[in-house]
Amino acid sequence: MIIVLSPAKTLDYEFESNHDHSVPAFLSQSSKLINILKTKEPKDIASLMGLSDKLATLNFDRYQSWSPAKKVSADSKPSMLVFKGDVYQGLQAEDLNNAEMKFAQKHIRILSGLYGILRPLDLMKPYRLEMGTKLETSEGKNLYEFWGDKVQKNVLNELKVQRSDLLINLAAKEYFTVLGKLPEDINVVTPTFKDYKNGNYKIISFYAKIARGLMAKWIIQNKVTNFEDLYGFDLDGYKYSKAESTATVPVFLRKSKEPDSLNFLTSTISSNDASLFSILAVIASVISF
């Protein structure tokens, strides 16, 4: 079984890791992309990625100083511990013990515009390159054409080694698309999370992202490898709904409560990792209840 996740824009390198580390599978391809990005001025980066001048300059500096990392350093640490976006608030990788991290290393994969695919302990340097970026390379006009079938082959080979056909999709469409058209014998399962709002259950993006991380954590901690076992996921008030689900899209429902949202907002604001977007999303969700 392989679980795929999206990366995050928010990164944190201010931690010490006692875990082992590994090296990304496609460092040579990453270097090719960086060499292209190194030729671009901050204004070009801002235009290409829709960034502010400040963020464009930050990433210009990142590209100029980037080099393939094979050792832990202040700016080269395990990927799943570095990412701190909404999904990773749910995952809380920093709390995993060695046995849990070993399970994650085998089963979790993070899709990446720069690295293609990352294992949790693969060393990663700070970067910004979303999969949907229309960066022209010798392989084509965007990153999907650059990566071609490399990422898919990597995942399929790993499933073959594990003698499994189960692929759990906890990634955003922008990233999952890099896997292309998968063989029909691969069982792709896409868990969906809905919260009760204004009289109906619906997908609330901010909560759904956190729920993806929660499910990843739950799978790791319970060492789940069978599809049917996913039905037992019950963290943070979510419950499996047989009536709402299909064979490939298990749906989990939660009747959100305003006090819980307010408590989460308080903890989010006090966290150094919280992004302004995440905070505003919680405020909007709370007000609308």
Where are these regions (language model features)?
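Internal, well-folded beta-alpha domain core
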Residues: 93-246, 251, 255-260
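Alpha-helix boundary/capping residues
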Residues: 37-40, 222, 277
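Short, glycine/charged-enriched secondary-structure capping and boundary segments
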Residues: 19, 182-184, 267
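Active-site helix-to-loop segments that bind/position phosphate- or nucleotide-bearing substrates
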Residues: 4-95
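Low-acidity, Ser/Thr- and Arg-rich intrinsically disordered low-complexity segments
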Residues: 261-281, 285-289
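N-terminal beta-strand-loop-alpha-helix module at the start
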Residues: 1
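Residue-level signature of transmembrane alpha-helix interfaces in integral membrane proteins
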Residues: 22, 132, 185, 279-288
